[in-house]
Curated annotation (Swiss-Prot):
Binds and inhibits integrins alpha-IIb/beta-3 (ITGA2B/ITGB3), alpha-V/beta-3 (ITGAV/ITGB3) and alpha-5/beta-1 (ITGA5/ITGB1). It comes from Cerastes cerastes. Its main location: secreted. SUPFAM superfamilies: Blood coagulation inhibitor (disintegrin). GO terms for molecular function: toxin activity. One of its GO terms (biological process) is cell adhesion. The keyword Secreted applies. It holds the Pfam family Disintegrin. This is Disintegrin CC5.
Length: 65
């Protein structure tokens, strides 16, 4: 494999030591985005979805307006 992801340990294919994540809507530059960062803008009667600061996933909001 010639082009390794900068966040990925090429042997384990997991985040390198000191890095939090490899990819995802709440991952940037190998780190989780801050809690409260919008990861999915509201549409229609839905509300924004926000990063938690502990995961690279974008959890669905639990509330509807």
């Amino acid at each position: 494999m010639n082009s390794a992801h900068p966040c990925c340990d090429p042997v384990t294919c997991k985040p390198k030591r000191g890095e939090h994540c490899i990819s995802g809507p709440c991952c940037r530059n190998c780190k989780f985005l801050s809690p409260g960062t919008i990861c999915k803008k509201a549409r229609g009667d839905d509300m924004n979805d926000y990063c938690t600061g502990i995961s690279s996933d974008c959890p669905r909001n639990r509330y509807k307006s």
